[in-house]
């Protein structure tokens, strides 16, 4: 009887740890998503009618979408559109797991097709996550290196790239809190 109680107790403890780890992972993902939104807003800023077909924080108006080309979106509408676009991008890259966020952010700026054909995706498909230099090299505008875009890439990478150390630290934090 005592052995059964210990086994049940151990099972509950393991389940509680797994549940805590899932909650920690979800909280980390939510917080990284908020960081991604913050970075995009910082560098895209709000687009005005003269920037057509870009609206809000860089959403490209697609055929069939109803936007008034003479009106600037409200902050809340632009924010909702940015979040929706970023989530769509991340879903496209979900096969890359923890790298779906950073790929989605890059696609938000340079386009989905460009990211899909990139050397970054090629390296990740080969299992090579040493992509910092390549990621930052996506800093050109009209063929020339652009300092502001380079700064953006560095900030995106430094704040959004999830390292193995980061994952280990998150797991240790969960264990310490139990």
What are these language model-derived features?
Residues 33-37, 96-105:
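Alpha-helical scaffolds flanking conserved acidic
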Residues 1-5, 9-46, 59-62, 66-92, ...:
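Long, amphipathic alpha-helical surface segments
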Residues 46-48, 99:
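Short, surface-exposed loop and linker segments with low hydrophobicity and enrichment for Pro/Ser/Thr
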Residues 50-52, 105, 150:
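N-terminal hydrophobic or amphipathic segments with adjacent small-residue motifs
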Residues 51-59:
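Early exported N-terminus immediately downstream of N-terminal targeting peptides
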């Amino acid at each position: 009887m005592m052995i059964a109680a210990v086994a049940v107790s151990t099972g509950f403890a393991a389940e509680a740890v797994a549940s805590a780890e899932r909650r920690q992972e979800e909280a980390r993902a939510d917080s990284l998503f908020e960081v991604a939104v913050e970075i995009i807003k910082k560098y895209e800023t709000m687009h005005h009618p003269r920037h057509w077909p870009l609206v809000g924080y860089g959403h490209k108006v697609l055929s069939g979408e109803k936007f008034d080309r003479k009106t600037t979106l409200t902050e809340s509408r632009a924010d909702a559109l940015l979040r929706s676009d970023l989530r769509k991008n991340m879903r496209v890259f979900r096969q890359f797991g923890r790298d779906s966020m950073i790929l989605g952010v890059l696609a938000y700026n340079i386009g989905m097709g460009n990211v899909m054909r990139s050397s970054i995706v090629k390296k990740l498909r080969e299992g090579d996550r040493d992509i910092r230099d390549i990621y930052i090299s996506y800093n050109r505008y009209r063929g020339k290196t652009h300092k502001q875009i380079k700064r953006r890439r560095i900030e995106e990478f430094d704040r959004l790239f999830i390292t193995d150390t980061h994952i280990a630290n998150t797991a240790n934090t969960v264990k310490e809190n139990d």
